[in-house]
């Protein structure tokens, strides 16, 4: 069983309001990583992100900061072109205070360009979470294992795979793929079976070798998320 860090996802509009800071402070003991989603901000810029990070840095000693731009292709709001998306991810390396950066994986990516960006982020001491999301279904077990394998070839700190289950076997396949991968690879693994059906993957993440589990602060930012206070309490049971 692995140690699991609880990630709290927030998705502010343009700025970090005092009410949001209060909500974070109220849950501070349950948060190991704060994920700042930025894809909900139309035409978001590095300067806007830097301003938000500055406001969050006041509390940063309590948790690590992860920045994520989730594209529409993988279930988010982001509508940047692929080049604009990758340029933004690369430029985030210059922002002090960011500890972790999410970069998406697709089967048709430019492998060399992706590797250059990941290496660039790591040179600026950013931990990389390479992720893939399927909000429609859960692929077969061998395909799940193949996706984990392809993502870890970039030598990130974390590989994250989130899929949508339609039955209990889908949940079991995701957990099996994560468990097998965590036993054989060096990087940390995250496996999420979304929706209420897959809640066990969030609460028992560590049992199957997972390193991060994602919750929310009030309003869920993904199917199946529960409040981080409840999530932390559940995770500590395993």
Swiss-Prot record:
Assigned EC number: 4.2.1.10
InterPro entries, alphabetized: Aldolase_TIM (IPR013785), DHquinase_I (IPR001381), Type-I_3-dehydroquinase (IPR050146)
Subunit structure of this chain's protein: Homodimer.
Lineage start: Bacteria, Bacillati, Bacillota, Bacilli, Bacillales
Family statement: Belongs to the type-I 3-dehydroquinase family.
GO biological process, one term: aromatic amino acid family biosynthetic process
NCBIfam families in the record: aroD
PANTHER family xrefs: 3-DEHYDROQUINATE DEHYDRATASE (PTHR43699:SF1)
Gene: aroD
Protein name listed in UniProt: 3-dehydroquinate dehydratase
Record-linked Gene3D superfamilies: Aldolase class I
